Amino acid sequence: MSTLMLIDDTHDGQRLDNFLISHLKGIPLTRIYRAIRKGEVRVNKKRVNANCRLTIGDLVRIPPLRQTNVKKLLPLDKSLLVSLEMRILFEEADLLVINKPAGLSVHGGSGIDRGLIEALCLRQPKSQALKLVHRLDRETSGCLVVAKKRSLLVALHALLTQRKVVKQYLLLVKGHWKWGKRQVDAPLKKNILRNGERIVKVDETGKMATTLFQPLVSYPFSTLMEARPLTGRTHQIRVHAAHLGHPIAGDKKYGDKVFNREMKMLGLKRLFLHSAGILCRWDDRVLGVCALLDTDLFRFLNFLKRRESQS
């Protein structure tokens, strides 16, 4: 028996194929597109193309399709659920901002059973439309904005494209930063090494990326920095910092092995990169959220400060 779904503001403006993909988990893409082509899927009783844009009030008829290869997720560890609940910095009906812990991927996949989004969906099972407004690397902690409605996702993506979202990061880099405040404009290109590892490099044929760096505190052999990316390329801050000769402490992919080993001996157990704050304005709304450094990074900075005073 077919299912009828009424489109609300959550899916207003979304393509039909993307709408179906998000709702028909476990259905092969080829089957979904075949159902559209053959007219099994109807919008307001009419045949439509896959790129049809849905609007509020549309009635979508979805035929019964056999689900295959649906993966059932095991229950989350209760301690993780409690931890995530405590790390929510701000929440409204259409969005939430969470202080993502280091070591947790934003999405499951590539051998990872479950990521942050999957965990948040289990926290509130009815919120199946949770979408990342932006991304953080697995080992990066801090502010992460999640949209509960597609209309908000589109609005915030537009702000990001227009460079109207201020994102502030804290990072500890190798050496003494000598330039003061500096803007880095260096194109980045994704590459795949012979061993299959994915890596990003500065390359003239890549996409332009811009990052603002500013030194905050100098320590022996390292500097605490603020970084504000004006674009959103993969690994942008990490690659730009390394490109200038100041790789981030604890960065196993782009960092300095000797420096990382020294930092680890002093007590740093992970990448020192933290999304400290985000600020944006749209319509009549303002979103401004800060995330304090995680305890491990805060204690490490205090250790460096004490070590400097004793030397």
Question: At which residue positions do the language-model features occur?
Answer:
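Short, well-ordered beta-strand segments enriched in hydrophobic/aromatic residues
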Residues: 96, 225-229
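Pseudouridine synthases involved in rRNA/tRNA modification
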Residues: 1-34, 66, 84-86, 204-207, ...
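Long C-terminal interaction/binding lobes of large macromolecular proteins
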Residues: 213
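Histidine- and/or cysteine-centered catalytic micro-motif in compact active-site loops
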Residues: 149, 174-176, 216-218, 228-230, ...
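Short aromatic-glycine motifs in intrinsically disordered, low-complexity regions
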Residues: 195-204
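RNA pseudouridine synthases
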Residues: 1-194, 218, 298-306
